[in-house]
Amino acid sequence: MLHHIPLFLSSTASPFFIRLIRFLTYSVIFTRSSSSICIVVLMPLLMYIRCPLSAPASAIYTFNCHLLSACQSRLKFVLISTMRPHHI
């Protein structure tokens, strides 16, 4: 089902995608409250999203902002360095 994500990102439903990612992020972080769970679940998703898809840069930056506000402080550097668009 992951092969449908590029088509979904290129559509006009990107705000829904951002809300979905925010829900998944908050549920993972606040139900588990463990940095290892956060890395194991979120990092593969981040690595897939930052692939050269047709995702708008604003969606990437919004996703980055919500991750930083939700994750623990020791994960901020890892998430920032993973989500920067110029690392693509």
Swiss-Prot record:
Protein name listed in UniProt: Uncharacterized 10.0 kDa protein
Top-level taxon of the source organism: Viruses
